[in-house]
C-alpha cells in the first residue's frame, strides 16, 4: 500500500487515508463472503447505460468500499472536472487546448465554444463532407484515373489515426459494404505497406493519408511509397487526386503532395489522436460500412457521454470502473489490468484501449509539474477469448501477481454456428467464476482421489492444481456488437481513463514522453544512411548497433 500522496488537495488526502485504512481492514475479505452476506449483491452491483450492462459484483469491494471511493472522487473534484471538459475549458493546459472529442458526437444544438467560437458548425460541415464523399464512393461515382470505381481503401496513419478506425472496422464486419475492402498501414517497417500493396490494383485503390500536421514520419514515408507505387503501376500525376485524399489540418502540405484542397478533411487541435476516430479520421469506418452506421457509432458514444455527464457518481459506469481501478492500483497493489473481449471481431480492442489508457495516464508529474508520489497509469493488455485461455490465463489464475480483469461479451452473435456462441459464453462466464472462486487444496485432492488416483500421488499433485481465487473482474455485456453499442463501449473506456486522470491530478491529454524518441530517431537516421556520418554523439551501445546495421546492409567498416 502506498503512502498518502502529498500532491493531492487536503480533502482528497483525507479520503485517500480512509481508503488506506479500509484496505487494511478488509485485507482478508473474500469476494464470495460478500455474496453470502448480501443475497441481492448481483442486482445492487449491476448497472445499465447506453445499451451496455456492467456486472461489477465480482469485485473485491463492499458497500463501504464504494462509498469511500465515491467520496474520493467527490473530494478530487470529479464533477467539476467532468463539466470543465464538456464545456470546452482548456484542460489540456500544457498545450493550451480544449479537449472536445465529445463534441464530435454531440448531436444537440447546444453551442460548444472554443476561443469564443461555436465549433458545432465546423463539425456538421465535416460530417456533410464525409457524407458526400462516402456516398460517391458507394454509388460508384468516385472514379479512378482509368474510369473504374474504387474497391480498395488504404488508410495510412499511426497511433490514434490507425488503432481506433481499425478496431471499429473490424468490429463492424457484419455491416461491411460488399464492394469495399479497407486496409490499414501504420508501421514504418516497409513490409507493412509492401504486403498491403501486393494484391491491389492502382486503378481501383484509394489512399487516405491521416496526419494532423502532414509531417508524421511514419505516415509520410508510407504515403510517399504508396504514391510511388501508384505512379509506377500506371497511375498518372493528373489522376493522383482521384486516388489520394487526406485528413489533416495542414491543407497546404496536402496540396503539395498532390491532394486537392477539397479532398482534405479537417482535423482540429481540440481532438487528440487517440480520441479521433469520431472525427474525419473515422473516414475508413464510414467507407467500410456507411454514414448511417458511422452516425450510429457517434450516437452510442453520445449516449455514454450523457450518462457520464448526468448520472450520480455512485451510479455512473465510467466513474465506478475508474474508481475500482484506482482501488486495485493504488490501495491493493495491482500494477496491470487485462481486457478480455469474448468476440473475435474485438480482437484488437485491447490494443486501442492500451493506447488510450497508457498514453493518457502514463505520466510521472501532476498538472502543476510536480513529481507524483503514487502509482499512476497501469499496464493495459489483453486479447480475444477464448484464445487467451490457452496463453496468459494460466498467470491470471495461479500467478503470484494478480490482475483485475474486464470480460466483454455480446449476448448474441451475428454469425450463429451450431453451439459456438453458447460455448464462447460458457467460457467467458466460467473464467470470471474461476478467478473469483478458485479451488482449494482439499477440493483439488478430493477430485484426484475421485478420479482413482492413489493417495500418495494425489498428495503430490494437489498443490499444483490449487487456484487461489478472490481475483476480481467486471463483466460487460450487450445484446450484440453493433455501431451503437461499439460507440458506447469505446466511449466508456475513454471516460474511465479520464476519471482516473482526475484522481491522479494528471493532464491525460498530452503525450510529451513520446517526443524524445522521435528527436533521437531523427539524429540517428542520417548515420544509418551515410556511412561517413559520425556516431560520436551516441552512447557506446547505440553506436555499436549503428555499425552493426551498416555492416548488415553492406555499408559498414
Curated annotation (Swiss-Prot):
One Pfam family matching this protein: PGI
Gene Ontology biological-process entries: gluconeogenesis; glucose 6-phosphate metabolic process; glycolytic process
UniProt entry keywords in alphabetical sequence: Cytoplasm, Gluconeogenesis, Glycolysis, Isomerase
Cellular component GO terms held in the UniProt record: cytosol
Biological pathway: Carbohydrate biosynthesis; gluconeogenesis; Carbohydrate degradation; glycolysis; D-glyceraldehyde 3-phosphate and glycerone phosphate from D-glucose: step 2/4
Subcellular location: Cytoplasm
Top-rank lineage group of the source organism: Bacteria
Active-site residues, record numbering mapped to chain: 359 (proton donor), 390, 518
Annotated signal peptide: none
Membrane spanning stretches: none
GO molecular function: carbohydrate derivative binding; glucose-6-phosphate isomerase activity; monosaccharide binding
UniProt cross-references to PANTHER family, sorted A to Z: GLUCOSE-6-PHOSPHATE ISOMERASE
Family per similarity comment: Belongs to the GPI family.
Function per UniProt: Catalyzes the reversible isomerization of glucose-6-phosphate to fructose-6-phosphate.
Identification of the protein by name: Glucose-6-phosphate isomerase
Gene: pgi
Amino acid at each position: 500500500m502506498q503512502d498518502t500522496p502529498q500532491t493531492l488537495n487536503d480533502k482528497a488526502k483525507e479520503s485517500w487515508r480512509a481508503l488506506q485504512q479500509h484496505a487494511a481492514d478488509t485485507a482478508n475479505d473474500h469476494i464470495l463472503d460478500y455474496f453470502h452476506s448480501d443475497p441481492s449483491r448481483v442486482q445492487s452491483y449491476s448497472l445499465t447505460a447506453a445499451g451496455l450492462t456492467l456486472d461489477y459484483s465480482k469485485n473485491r469491494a463492499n458497500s463501504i468500499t464504494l462509498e469511500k471511493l465515491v467520496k474520493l472522487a467527490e473530494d478530487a473534484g470529479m464533477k467539476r472536472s467532468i463539466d470543465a471538459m464538456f464545456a470546452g475549458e482548456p484542460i489540456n493546459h500544457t498545450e493550451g487546448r480544449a479537449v472536445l472529442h465529445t463534441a464530435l458526437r454531440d448531436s444537440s444544438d447546444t453551442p460548444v465554444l472554443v476561443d469564443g467560437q461555436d465549433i458545432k458548425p465546423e463539425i456538421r460541415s465535416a460530417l456533410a463532407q464525409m457524407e458526400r464523399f462516402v456516398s460517391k464512393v458507394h454509388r460508384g461515382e468516385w472514379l479512378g484515373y482509368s474510369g473504374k470505381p474504387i474497391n480498395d481503401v488504404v488508410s495510412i496513419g499511426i497511433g490514434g489515426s490507425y488503432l481506433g478506425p481499425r478496431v471499429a472496422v473490424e468490429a463492424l464486419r457484419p455491416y461491411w459494404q460488399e464492394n469495399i475492402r479497407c486496409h490499414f498501414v501504420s508501421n514504418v517497417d516497409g513490409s507493412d505497406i509492401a504486403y498491403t500493396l501486393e494484391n491491389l490494383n492502382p486503378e481501383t485503390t484509394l489512399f487516405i493519408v491521416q496526419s494532423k500536421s502532414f509531417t508524421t514520419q511514419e505516415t509520410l514515408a508510407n504515403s510517399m511509397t504508396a504514391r510511388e507505387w501508384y505512379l509506377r503501376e500506371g497511375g498518372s500525376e493528373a489522376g493522383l487526386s482521384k486516388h489520394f485524399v487526406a485528413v489533416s489540418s495542414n491543407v497546404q502540405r496536402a496540396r503539395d503532395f498532390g491532394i486537392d484542397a477539397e479532398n482534405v478533411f479537417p482535423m482540429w487541435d481540440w481532438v487528440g489522436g487517440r480520441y479521433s476516430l469520431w472525427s474525419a479520421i473515422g473516414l475508413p469506418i464510414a467507407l467500410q460500412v456507411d454514414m448511417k452506421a458511422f452516425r450510429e457509432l457517434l450516437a452510442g458514444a453520445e449516449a455514454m457521454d450523457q450518462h457520464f455527464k448526468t448520472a450520480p457518481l455512485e451510479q455512473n459506469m465510467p466513474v465506478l470502473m475508474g474508481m475500482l481501478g484506482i482501488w486495485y492500483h493504488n490501495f491493493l497493489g495491482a500494477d496491470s489490468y487485462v481486457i478480455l473481449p469474448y468476440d473475435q471481431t474485438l480482437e484488437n480492442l485491447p490494443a486501442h484501449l492500451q493506447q488510450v489508457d497508457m498514453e493518457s495516464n502514463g505520466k510521472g508529474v501532476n498538472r502543476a509539474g510536480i513529481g507524483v508520489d503514487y502509482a499512476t497509469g497501469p499496464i493495459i493488455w489483453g486479447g480475444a477469448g477464448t484464445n487467451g485461455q490457452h496463453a496468459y490465463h494460466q498467470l491470471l489464475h495461479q500467478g503470484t501477481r494478480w490482475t483485475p480483469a474486464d470480460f466483454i461479451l455480446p449476448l448474441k452473435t451475428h454469425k450463429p454456428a451450431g453451439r459456438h456462441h453458447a460455448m464462447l459464453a460458457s467460457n467467458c462466464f466460467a473464467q470470471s467464476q474461476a478467478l473469483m472462486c478458485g479451488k482449494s487444496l482439499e477440493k483439488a485432492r478430493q477430485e484426484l482421489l475421485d478420479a482413482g488416483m492413489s493417495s500418495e500421488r494425489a498428495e503430490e499433485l494437489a498443490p499444483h492444481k490449487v487456484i487461489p481465487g478472490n481475483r476480481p473482474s467486471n463483466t460487460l455485456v450487450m445484446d450484440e456488437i453493433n455501431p451503437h453499442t461499439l460507440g458506447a463501449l469505446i466511449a466508456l473506456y475513454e471516460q474511465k481513463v479520464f476519471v482516473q486522470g482526475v484522481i491522479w491530478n494528471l493532464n491525460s491529454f498530452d503525450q510529451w514522453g513520446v517526443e524524445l524518441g522521435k528527436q533521437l530517431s531523427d539524429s540517428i537516421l542520417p548515420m544509418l544512411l551515410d556511412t561517413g556520418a559520425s556516431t560520436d554523439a551516441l552512447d557506446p551501445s547505440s553506436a555499436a548497433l549503428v555499425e552493426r546495421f551498416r555492416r548488415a546492409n553492406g555499408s559498414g567498416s
